[in-house]
Regions:
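Active-site HxH/HxHxD metal-binding segment of metal-dependent hydrolases
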Residues: 1-27, 118-123
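Metallo-beta-lactamase
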Residues: 11, 34-110, 117, 121-122
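Short coil/loop residues immediately preceding or within conserved phosphate-binding loops
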Residues: 23, 32-35
Length: 127
């Protein structure tokens, strides 16, 4: 896999659309969106997921389900240690189905099945 941060892309910035999650604001935001905010760093240091009451997890870019991903592992990882910890955290949550940012939804069992593949992941510095 390729990764290691150091983005070289021009940022797209819409500050008027920001939702800033802090210890003070998190509970209110979770109430408004009716989901629990789960920190899932690794893909990026500020990656999050949303766990809904109907046992659905929106995991953002913490997992994928489609080309070019293999085994539901995202193709860009900034911090492999954090990424592995986030997968472990996801497997310990109470949900039935995962909705990734890229690809079709899949089951918690599939996430658990491919967790062992993370041990073989190596990052290569770009540039």
């Amino acid at each position: 896999l390729f990764g290691k941060g150091d983005d070289r892309f021009e940022p797209v910035d819409f500050p008027e659309r920001y939702v800033i999650v802090t210890k003070k604001t998190q509970t209110e935001i979770e109430r408004m969106i009716t989901a629990k905010i789960i920190k899932l760093p690794g893909h990026t240091n500020d990656s999050i997921g949303l766990l809904f009451e109907n046992r659905v997890l929106f995991c953002g870019d913490a997992a994928m389900n489609g080309i070019p991903s293999r085994n539901h592992i995202t193709i860009w990882i900034e911090n492999l240690k954090d990424y592995k910890a986030s997968w472990k955290k996801m497997t310990q949550l109470d949900f039935k189905k995962v909705y990734p940012s890229h690809g079709k939804p899949f089951t918690k069992e599939q996430l658990i099945k491919y967790q062992q593949k993370l041990q073989k992941v190596h990052l290569y510095l770009l540039g």
